[in-house]
Regions:
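Periodic small-residue-enriched repeat registers in elongated scaffold domains
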Residues: 1-168
């Protein structure tokens, strides 16, 4: 793409204004950024330019949602404006923040609208009818000591939904 930068071993920057630094990273969408080792910013299953303004930093992180951010190790921010930090966390609701270790995903509203705001329950002062979804989660799942990634037992210590409900 135009104005892309790829510095390092086997890095790819595709999509206008994308930057890829480190080793074996992919910056797929428009204005996406990767740094570290084996990270992906953008939705590689879609055309170049989809899921723009995503950032993936660290080791084996994925930021595939539009304007999403993932960092640290083996984290995934897969919905729009979502953030995943820690070890093997997944942020799969609109605007969600997942921190900690190996959280349980698939809770709330995991519908993805890559270009608009269909995944959020409250727009233009009106409730849309969508599930309020998860705003914040702290994962406290196990770690697979042989891989250093999340194990087979994901778990959540704390969940806050957009409607204000909290679960311990």
């Amino acid at each position: 793409g135009a104005s892309t930068v790829a510095i390092g071993y086997k890095n790819h920057a595709a999509g206008a204004g994308s930057v890829s630094l480190g080793q074996e990273n992919i910056a797929w969408g428009t204005t996406n950024f990767t740094a570290g080792y084996q990270n992906i910013a953008g939705d590689t299953n879609a055309s170049i330019g989809t899921a723009g303004s995503a950032t993936a930093i660290g080791l084996q992180t994925i930021a595939s949602g539009r304007s999403s951010f993932s960092a640290n190790k083996n984290t995934s921010a897969i919905n729009q404006a979502s953030t995943a930090l820690g070890l093997s966390t997944v942020s799969d609701n609109f605007g969600m923040l997942a921190i900690g270790v190996n959280n349980e995903a698939g809770i709330g509203d995991t519908s993805i609208d890559p270009n608009d705001y269909g995944g959020y329950y409250y727009a233009d002062g009106t409730y849309t009818g969508s599930n309020p979804g998860v705003a914040f989660v702290i994962g406290n799942g196990d770690i697979d000591s042989s891989t250093g990634k999340g194990g087979d037992n994901p778990s959540n210590a704390f969940i806050i939904s957009y409607d204000g409900n909290a679960t311990l």
